[in-house]
Design a protein with these regions (language model features):
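C-terminal helical subdomain
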Residues: 181, 200-255
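Residue(s) in the substrate-gating loop at a strand-loop-helix junction
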Residues: 141
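Active-site-adjacent segment of SDR/Rossmann-fold oxidoreductases
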Residues: 30, 125, 129, 146, ...
Length: 263
């Protein structure tokens, strides 16, 4: 069954720039009623909202400054968004970083932000609490399906997002909240441009850059187009990949009992 984006209210964390901004733009282009952008960067956030307003109309996008690693502030801001927009239909937990040097920040943002954002979405949208249900999209990465040894903490954080989402989707019948996971491949964003500077000192940054240069890069628009399709077509619990500037595809995890090996 096709999920209609038209007239839906949306929250995007980390939406001031990069892929998050493109999510907001593409959803508005597909008829979303309004998009709330949460981001730590106030000036870029305000600029992004102004640009979206010029393209789609006044009040189609609203900016809320928020550090999603601050659990108290995040909850307060989420409540403010809910009250300002008179509810939410879609929550995209996109805020993240790629910084293995500051591994505590990476875990707080990539893991903690997604977990709290998901729990807040279920608390407010969940049918078990009087809500009408909705959709959560958690942003993982293709590294959540494999490994990238140069960025150990980033990989671990995205594997966490994947496992968390796969657990949470089991409560759809009770909450009415669909849980989807998007796994972008290598995408042209500021995070990728600085990854060589964010690795641990035992990792050769030149080798990291050499590997990145050898891989196909996709524009942020390709991931955003995939996001629209995921929200429209994705069944609860589905995991989609958007990479190599190609159309998205879904993946399934095998049953471990079917791939066990003798030892």
């Amino acid at each position: 069954m096709m999920e209609n984006i038209k007239d839906k209210t949306v929250l995007v964390t980390g939406g001031a720039s990069g892929i998050g901004f493109q999510y907001a733009k593409k959803l508005l282009a597909n008829g979303a009623k309004v998009v709330a952008i949460l981001d730590l960067s106030t000036s870029p956030g305000q600029t992004s909202v102004a640009n979206l307003g010029k393209e789609f109309g006044k009040d189609k996008a609203v900016f809320f400054p928020c550090d999603v690693t601050d659990t108290v502030k995040f909850e307060e801001t989420f409540k403010n968004v809910w009250n300002t927009l008179n509810g939410l239909d879609i929550v995209i937990n996109n805020a993240g970083t790629l910084n293995d040097k500051d591994w505590q920040l990476t875990i707080k943002l990539n893991v903690g932000g997604v977990i709290q954002g998901s729990f807040l979405a279920i608390d407010y949208m969940g049918k078990h609490k009087g809500g009408k249900g909705g959709t959560i999209v958690n942003i993982a990465s293709v590294v959540a399906l494999t490994t990238y040894p140069a960025v150990q903490v980033y990989c671990a954080s995205k594997h966490n997002v994947m496992a968390f989402s796969r657990c949470l989707q089991n409560y759809y019948e009770k909450t009415g909240v669909r849980v989807l996971t998007m796994c972008p491949g290598l995408t042209d964003t500021p995070l990728v441009a600085t990854v060589g500077k964010m690795v641990r000192d035992f990792v050769d940054p030149n080798e990291v850059q050499k590997l990145i240069n050898s891989l196909p890069m996709q524009p942020t628009e390709n991931v955003a187009n995939a996001m629209v399709l995921l929200i429209q077509k994705g069944k609860n619990g589905e995991i989609w990949v958007s990479e190599c500037n190609q159309k998205p595809y879904a993946v399934e995890f095998p049953d471990v009992r079917k791939i066990e090996l003798d030892v």
